[in-house]
Amino acid sequence: MSNPACSNLFNNGCDHNSFNYSTSLSYIYNSHGSYYYSNTTNPNYINHTHTTSTSPNSPPLREALPLLSLSPIRHQEQQDQHYFMDTHQISSSNFLDDPLVTVDLHLGLPNYGVGESIRSNIAPDATTDEQDQDHDRGVEVTVESHLDDDDDHHGDLHRGHHYWIPTPSQILIGPTQFTCPLCFKTFNRYNNMQMHMWGHGSQYRKGPESLRGTQPTGMLRLPCFCCAPGCKNNIDHPRAKPLKDFRTLQTHYKRKHGSKPFACRMCGKAFAVKGDWRTHEKNCGKLWYCSCGSDFKHKRSLKDHVKAFGNGHVPCGIDSFGGDHEDYYDAASDIEQ
């Protein structure tokens, strides 16, 4: 029969070792080939460290180290990278789903070229009444404003001055067409139309006041550039200079760029301006002589010669090809009438 005291002691010890002995075992392998067993218990218990020495002939088994790709740091970086890629894709898809937005970028300095024009239906110098009348007649005028002060090759135009570049039809026909309300004949000048109206009856005669037209005088006084390319009076020419006014431009355009319907019946020379043709036929075939023996085809050339040499040089007379010269001139006068 056992001793009750010993039995109680044994049972208490077993219970203590069975239920209250909670351990946490960790294995640590050092470089000397020893395993350390660390038993972590409550503060009331004992930690046991057991050192096992292995013989050199039988090295201990070594566990394979985990791959670096499975390390927590690398795994976290991969997760962050995947999250960034997913976020970028979502933002890109949202941008594509949004309606397109157009942005105008104005890069560079503003270009204030000479070719920039201010299109208007009237001249800036015209009065209000003239502007209304020009608009009613449908006059289309291109008014250019010179903006570059540093350009020396554009004549005497400066900032704030205006000029006009008429079209070929405006040059040849005229900027304004006045129409007779009875026969619908057109005239370039208001005075000519009024005189034509007098022929329809005395009821259209209203005295001298009826001849005072309302032409766009402000527009006709503007300096004009020629519209023909390559002309020295074209605005794109390196040394372009504007012509004084519209009438001067008309004569220039007819002489330099227009057709020449008038031909001299003495020599066959063609002219674009009727006045030039009349003057030429009047003097064609004539020779002007100087007292020094020089002859000239033009009277103005003889005058320049006498003025240049002075004493001893005086006009002597005029010679012509034949007596039929006056007949040619008379015939030309009859045609003009």
UniProtKB/Swiss-Prot annotation:
Motif Nuclear localization signal in this chain: 254-257, 297-300
Annotated function: Probable transcriptional regulator.
PROSITE patterns given in the database record: ZINC_FINGER_C2H2_1 (PS00028), ZINC_FINGER_C2H2_2 (PS50157)
Organism phylogeny: Eukaryota, Viridiplantae, Streptophyta, Embryophyta, Tracheophyta
Xref: PANTHER family: ZINC FINGER PROTEIN WIP2, ZINC FINGER PROTEIN WIP5
Zinc finger boundaries on the chain: C2H2-type: 178-200, 225-257, 262-284, 288-313
A Gene Ontology term for the protein's cellular component: nucleus
GO biological process: primary root development; regulation of DNA-templated transcription
The organism of origin for this protein: Arabidopsis thaliana
Pfam families: C2CH-3rd_BIRD-IDD, zf-C2H2, zf-C2H2_STOP2_3rd
Disulfide bonds: none
Top-level taxon of the source organism: Eukaryota
Any one GO molecular-function label of the UniProt entry: zinc ion binding
Family: Belongs to the WIP C2H2-type zinc-finger protein family.
Keywords: Metal-binding, Nucleus, Repeat, Transcription, Transcription regulation, Zinc, Zinc-finger
The keyword Metal-binding is assigned to this record: yes
Keyword Membrane found: no
Protein name: Zinc finger protein WIP5
Localization, UniProt: Nucleus
